[in-house]
Amino acid sequence: MSLESIKYTRGSLEILDQLLLPLQTRYIKVRGVEDGWKVINKMQVRGAPAIAIVGCLSLAVELSPDNESSKKNMRQEIEGKLNYLVSARPTAVNIKLAADELINLANTLCADDSISAEIFKERFIGSIEDMLTKDIHDNKAIGSLGCEAILKNIDGDSPVRVLTHCNTGSLATAGYGTALGVIRSLHATKRLEHVFCTETRPYNQGARLTAYELVHEKIPSTLMVDSMVSALMHTRKIHAVIVGADRVAANGDTANKMGTYQIAIVAKYHDVPFYVAAPLTSIDMSLPYGEKIKIEERPDREMTHIGEHRIAAPGINCWNPSFDVTPASLIAGIITEKGVFAPDHLKSVKXHVTGKKYYNIIHI
């Protein structure tokens, strides 16, 4: 059974504190937007899909109690709070897309004189709740389609060995996962022989989170340090690399956790197919190529300390961008809920992501 990183019922939201994993399992109450911003910014919840869901649900929780606000006041409050939530972590595109669509929904509901303030709030909150359901459904589709694409390139019924980086499972999404969802689907077919996961310095999402999920689900796996990828591919047959994405540009360039780019280079050298698994909400058609993606920089302390213990020499300068950008030329395929696309064919999914709502949340 997959881990439950988000617990939500109308008016109540709890998230699993990922900073405490794997040693402690503790849920944090999110009582509103301020709490939502903090848990996203502090990386107590992380992963582009999960950031979007938790941010929007924090607004739903804040709006749930009875109040006498007019439609106009609610609309203004919604826009301000959603824009504030987007600022918590700027690289992940999903929360920006969700915020834009919810603001559009609020504007539409506010302009309709036949809709009361009570119905406005009910429909708005209901639309956010629909996002939670859709995210899980989309992740399962990504898992199935990615599994199928990888097995097509494997001779006969040979067992499959894969490598993944960072964390892209139930802890990074509303449930099931993107790249780790593909791995779950491979495991369900009984074709998965082994998963290798990187520790993912400096925040150790692979060691703390991915390894935790793999052990929890009894998926055969091995943890390795980030600098071992070349040796792994040289000495052992790896059939595919599967990673997630925080933002994909229109040409297929992909921003993902720092270290992804160098893994893609090594995979190319060793003729290992490199796949990106991401929902359509992670594709940003407004950005023509990856150099336009804004890269978040994290505090030095995340590099110099583990917990309260300093591991780096005092006085050393640090450079700690959270993401790098993998060029589309290194990517074999981008796995979405609508299919697996070569990066130069992303324009064929434009109908799904342009002129149409990513989250399909407009319900008037």
Curated annotation (Swiss-Prot):
Record's GO cellular component terms: cytoplasm; nucleus
GO molecular function, one term: S-methyl-5-thioribose-1-phosphate isomerase activity
Top EC class of this enzyme: isomerase
Subcellular location, record wording: Cytoplasm; Nucleus
Its EC number(s): 5.3.1.23
Main location: cytoplasm
Taxonomy, superkingdom: Eukaryota
Active site: 246
Catalysed conversion reaction: 5-(methylsulfanyl)-alpha-D-ribose 1-phosphate = 5-(methylsulfanyl)-D-ribulose 1-phosphate
Pathway as given in its UniProt record: Amino-acid biosynthesis; L-methionine biosynthesis via salvage pathway; L-methionine from S-methyl-5-thio-alpha-D-ribose 1-phosphate: step 1/6
Site feature (Transition state stabilizer) residues: 166
InterPro entries, per database record: IF-2B-related (IPR000649), IF-M1Pi (IPR005251), IF_2B-like_C (IPR042529), Initiation_fac_2B_a/b/d (IPR011559), M1Pi_N (IPR027363), NagB/RpiA_transferase-like (IPR037171)
GO biological process, one term: L-methionine salvage from methylthioadenosine
Keywords: Amino-acid biosynthesis, Cytoplasm, Isomerase, Methionine biosynthesis, Nucleus
Family per record: Belongs to the eIF-2B alpha/beta/delta subunits family. MtnA subfamily.
The protein's role, per its UniProt record: Catalyzes the interconversion of methylthioribose-1-phosphate (MTR-1-P) into methylthioribulose-1-phosphate (MTRu-1-P).
Name the record gives this protein: Methylthioribose-1-phosphate isomerase
Taxonomy of the source species: Eukaryota, Metazoa, Ecdysozoa, Arthropoda, Hexapoda
